[in-house]
Design a protein with these regions (language model features):
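Short coil/turn connectors at secondary-structure junctions
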Residues: 20-24, 32, 73-76, 106-109, ...
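Single conserved hydrophobic/aromatic residue that forms the stacking wall/gate
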Residues: 1-7, 11, 176
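N-terminal glycine-rich phosphate/adenylate-binding segment common to multiple enzyme folds
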Residues: 8-49, 138
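Short acidic loop-to-helix transition motifs that present clustered carboxylates
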Residues: 114-121
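Glycine-rich phosphate/diphosphate-binding loop of Rossmann-like nucleotide-binding domains
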Residues: 47-114
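Glycine-rich phosphate/nucleotide-binding loop
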Residues: 123-177
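Solvent-exposed alpha-helices and their adjacent loops that cap or buttress functional pockets
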Residues: 16-21, 43, 71-72, 103-105, ...
């Protein structure tokens, strides 16, 4: 896999009617691991399994990328949304790598964590409390769409996928016409 990070800039656009006028956040999503790795198999007829992949290298890479991005853009706080209370190993690794990068390289930035369920509730209650969200692949996909809904829909939020040597820019998700 080429290394890839996704960033979505979520803010209120002029001329787009929304419930919220105070949204200004960035979503940083790890884009190659997690359940979207495509590692699935049929254990026995009628029973299938999907494997969630998390590597220390991938988790540290996206953590560094997110903190460097936040620092360069003069953002103040990174919030990691996770489910480490249930997925202790995979989400635990993601969370621990982000905390390690914060403590060792970017102590000047604020750092908080939230369980994904509670984080989504907080997002719809008051999105202004967030600045940069750092998420693993599946959570980032879902939360990007949720946040697009806060500011007018999928077609109004720009997204970028950054690889080692190339980048792709697009709307956060496809839209149905």
């Amino acid at each position: 896999h080429p290394r890839s990070s996704a960033a979505s800039d979520v803010y209120k656009r002029q001329g787009v009617h929304t419930r919220y006028n105070n949204v200004d956040l960035v979503i940083i999503r790890e884009n190659t691991e997690g359940l979207y790795s495509g590692v699935e198999n049929e254990v026995t007829p009628g029973v299938v399994m999907s494997m969630k992949v998390a590597t220390q290298k991938g988790c540290e890479r996206i953590g560094r990328w997110a903190f460097r991005f936040a620092n360069r853009r003069e953002r103040r706080k990174i919030t990691v949304l996770h489910k480490a209370n249930i997925m202790k190993m995979t989400d635990g690794l993601f969370l621990n790598c982000a905390a390690h990068v914060h403590e060792n390289d970017y102590p000047n930035l604020q750092f908080e964590t939230a369980i994904i369920d509670a984080g989504c509730m907080r997002l719809v209650q008051d999105p202004s409390q967030f600045d940069v969200l750092l998420l693993e692949n599946l959570y980032g996909d879902v939360v990007s769409d949720l946040c697009a809904g806060l500011v007018g829909g999928l077609g109004v939020v720009p997204g970028a996928n950054f690889g080692d040597e190339e980048a792709i820019f697009e709307a956060v998700s496809y839209t149905h016409l």
